[in-house]
Amino acid sequence: MAGCVVGEPASAPGQRVTLLAIDGGGIRGLIPGTILAFLEARLQELDGPDARLADYFDCIAGTSTGGLITAMLAAPGDHGRPLFAASDINRFYLDNGPRIFPQKRCGMAAAMAALTRPRYNGKYLQGKIRKMLGETRVRDTLTNVVIPTFDVRLLQPTIFSTYDAKSMPLKNALLSDICISTSAAPTYLPAHCFQTTDDATGKVREFDLIDGGVAANNPTMVAMTQITKKIMVKDKEELYPVKPSDCGKFLVLSLGTGSTSDQGMYTARQCSRWGIVRWLRNKGMAPIIDIFMAASSDLVDIHAAVMFQSLHSDGDYLRIQDNTLHGDAATVDAATRDNMRALVGIGERMLAQRVSRVNVETGRYVEVPGAGSNADALRGFARQLSEERRARLGRRNACGGGGEGEPSGVACKR
């Protein structure tokens, strides 16, 4: 269970950049959903029942199912507050998972269909997302968001962010289109095409997108890059008090959706006999897709861990991940009642497990001697977030601003 001790802050409160990043993983979004509900509850203990995660993070980033969670946490709902509380996330998956991923009978006809079209038609998911997010565009979010996708026409990642949407009208897409796109995992859900228009110039841009997990299943570094770009251009709306190279002032929470890396998924002997069909479908899994996404997540974690360790800022990077999944829990689409309950249970057990961190030499996760549980680390993280927010609000009030519940990242708050 990957993590890192949250220790003494490297910077004074009110001088940090706070980031939440959530991996992709289909129905396994129940795992980070459980952890986020715990974190928000700790923030509510500190700052009152109206506290929401969007009040504390300068940026929330998510890929695939993590992008959907990002939208839930950052999209505006009633009275300008977030559409979802963190405690509502799992209810969304439990209520809608079986209809997003309907469990079909196996057989020759189903096997042949899987070779010629996506396993799911995506209509229920698309309709649910459109109803939930309506006409909200990415620049409308209550705090900055970063959601990776991949453009199959251009063969390159397309990153949607609140940062870009404010200055690039053609990137100011409907949040619903972005969420549908980042969730379009190859072989599981259909690719998504849409257009945006710049009303001032009449220019139109077309996007042909699939799941961002093929490029950045763990969006931590993508989000840090987006923030660093804003720092470099000295954006007046997002005047962060750091230098582009100063990762020591970032406070990062990165949540995985689980993996099988400690269990040993495949062997070279097995793979050496596979052709196209087996790489695309094997015992209910899509090995080539799973491998790409697992590699993306783990490499980003190792990169981030090395970066923070080199700056003696280990305590500013908290990664929580479970590498022991097996069976249905390891799939992205096993939306049975039993498996969904099991995934919630995995999230709850992760909270109780000891903090661990990646060994940058082996890529394996090891417990940190003398550290507490992941729940203890999140309590410490919540205290730092609360102190950061209070310092910003105090500074904002001192310079004539105001307003509880406003997003982070505004110059006056610094």
From Swiss-Prot:
* Protein name (Swiss-Prot/TrEMBL): Patatin-like protein 1
Q: Which residues form the active site?
A: S64 (nucleophile), D211 (proton acceptor)
Described purpose of this protein according to its UniProt entry: Possesses non-specific lipolytic acyl hydrolase (LAH) activity. Hydrolyzes phospholipids as well as galactolipids. May play a role in disease resistance.
Q: Which residues form a coiled coil?
A: none
Cite the domain annotation text: The nitrogen atoms of the two glycine residues in the GGXR motif define the oxyanion hole, and stabilize the oxyanion that forms during the nucleophilic attack by the catalytic serine during substrate cleavage.
Motif extent (GXSXG): 62-66
Question: Which PANTHER family has this protein been placed in?
Answer: PATATIN-LIKE PROTEIN 1, XYLOSE ISOMERASE
Domain (PNPLA) ranges: 20-224
Keywords associated with the record: Hydrolase, Lipid degradation, Lipid metabolism, Plant defense
Would I find Lipid metabolism among this entry's keywords?
A: yes
Q: Where is this motif: DGA/G?
A: 211-213
Specify the species.
Answer: Oryza sativa subsp. indica (Rice)
The EC number on file is: 3.1.1.-
Task: Name the domain of life.
Answer: Eukaryota
Enzyme class, UniProt record, top EC level: hydrolase
Q: Name one GO biological process term.
A: defense response
Family classification: Belongs to the patatin family.
Motif segment (GXGXXG) = 24-29
One molecular function GO term is: monoacylglycerol lipase activity
